[in-house]
């Protein structure tokens, strides 16, 4: 879609000499949620004392199971795996860490086992916990020619376990690179011959390994498949389900409050009609992603409020403001002063005021916690984001296609991931100044995540953006550099 002409003043003025403002409007899909969460009854989200007492009793039983001695260490590994996949491991972090440390320190615990399933499960759980378990443990499953043995091909459970373990590989884990290729090939070839239940597990794993599923989605899914496992324990499942429902009530309460603020305080979509009406999407993807646990409720609310304003900023730069207006807006954000409001176009004033209000709220919260330094990092992250948005707007205005390197340098910022990482620490009381310094120092792990997020976003949005004459994507920059045409 090309740029649309929109009158810059009220339509009832019919002066033909009035200039017409061209805005890069986008046709965003409407929210599928509407006022669903706003209409939630607060009483329906209350948690009964009976439920809290029951979940505590079940928690104690699961804790006893976790700490009980076992003859076969694989039983303990399977219990830990179930607890993690069911989304309740946050209750037992200390216990799980102690158990896995003992297993890591004792190489006899499955280290000499010839059971592919158990060896792979042990490896994955230890790598997830941060232990640099050597990958050459899988050499025992190779033949003299360096290929994985024929004997394991029909071990579906073992192959699937090795497949999941291979996704914990790091640079230099050549055997895990081979394992990923081998297991993927085997699973794809056997899936059509498996019973429906196992086939469904395999297809889901091939679509996305455990490491890449959001914890809440994996927990909800595993409720239905866990009973089919040989290690199924009804107490563990009942505890996980009740805990899930209790936390879900908390999440519903949070998204209800954020939705109400989105509509009533920020005025979306009635007063600010050009932005994506996506507060529920923001909550689910941006906020539950970093942390779903109940102890981070305050952090989610703080992050949600900032993310809401940042989303409006994004669409203002991307789908409404002219370059001249955006320069004024960026200048106001850099200066961060109430006095700047008067220099802004009318439609920008409420967004800028909301930005000032939320940072004032953060200042008050951080002061109470003795962590006022968090305010500085919040402002700097948003300023950096605004400057990157403005550069994109400049490229669009000039129809400039940057080099891949030039594009990625700016696009990693506009993707918002590094901003999200920084802001997610606001509501975490144990996040020190050193933590914020680390997050803002462009660490490799954050840069890698930024790169993945940006490229994935560009892959799915390029066609839509090109239709509206939008700023180029990584794909456009690469195609120009490679002098190739769209297939």
Name each model-derived stretch:
Residues 1-487:
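Terpene synthase/cyclase
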């Amino acid at each position: 879609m090309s740029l649309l002409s929109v009158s810059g003043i009220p339509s009832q003025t019919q002066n033909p000499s009035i200039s017409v403002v061209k805005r890069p409007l986008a046709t965003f899909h409407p929210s599928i949620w509407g006022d669903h969460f706003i209409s939630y009854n607060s009483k329906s989200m209350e948690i009964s004392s009976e439920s809290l007492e029951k979940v505590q009793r079940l928690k104690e039983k699961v804790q006893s199971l976790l700490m009980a001695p076992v003859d076969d260490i694989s039983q303990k590994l399977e219990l830990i795996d179930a607890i993690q996949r069911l989304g309740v491991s946050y209750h037992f972090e200390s216990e799980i860490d102690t158990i896995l440390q003992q297993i890591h320190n004792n190489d006899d615990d499955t280290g000499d086992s010839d059971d592919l399933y158990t060896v792979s499960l042990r490896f994955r759980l230890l790598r997830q916990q941060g232990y640099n378990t050597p990958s050459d443990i899988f050499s025992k499953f190779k033949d003299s020619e360096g290929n994985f043995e024929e004997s394991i091909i029909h071990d579906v459970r073992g192959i699937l376990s090795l497949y999941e373990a291979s996704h914990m590989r790091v640079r230099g884990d050549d055997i895990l690179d081979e394992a990923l290729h081998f297991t993927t090939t085997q699973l794809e070839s056997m899936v059509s011959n498996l019973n429906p239940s196992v086939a469904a597990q395999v297809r889901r794993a091939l679509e996305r390994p455990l490491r890449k599923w959001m914890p809440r989605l994996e927990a909800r899914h595993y409720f239905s498949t866990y009973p089919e496992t040989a290690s199924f324990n009804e107490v563990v499942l009942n505890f996980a389900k009740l805990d899930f429902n209790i936390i879900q009530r908390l999440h519903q309460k949070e998204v209800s409050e954020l939705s109400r603020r989105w509509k009533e305080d920020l005025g979306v979509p009635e007063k600010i009609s050009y932005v994506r009406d996506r507060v529920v999407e923001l909550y689910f993807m941006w906020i539950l992603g970093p942390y779903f646990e109940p102890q981070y409720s305050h952090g989610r609310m703080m992050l949600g409020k900032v993310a809401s304003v940042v989303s409006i900023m994004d669409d203002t730069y991307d789908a409404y403001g002219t370059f001249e207006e955006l320069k004024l807006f960026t200048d106001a954000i850099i200066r961060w002063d109430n006095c700047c409001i008067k220099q802004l176009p009318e439609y920008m004033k409420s967004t800028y005021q909301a930005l000032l209000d939320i940072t004032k709220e953060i200042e008050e919260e951080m002061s109470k916690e003795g962590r006022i330094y968090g305010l500085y990092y919040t402002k700097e992250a948003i300023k950096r984001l605004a400057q990157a948005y403005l550069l994109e707007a400049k490229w669009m205005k000039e129809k400039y296609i940057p080099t891949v390197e030039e594009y990625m340098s700016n696009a990693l910022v506009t993707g918002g991931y590094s901003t999200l990482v920084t802001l997610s620490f606001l509501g975490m009381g144990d996040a020190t100044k050193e933590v914020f310094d680390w997050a803002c120092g462009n660490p490799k792990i954050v840069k890698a995540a930024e790169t993945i997020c940006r490229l994935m976003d560009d892959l799915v949005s390029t066609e839509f953006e090109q239709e509206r004459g939008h700023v180029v994507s990584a794909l456009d920059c690469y195609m120009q550099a490679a002098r190739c045409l769209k297939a």
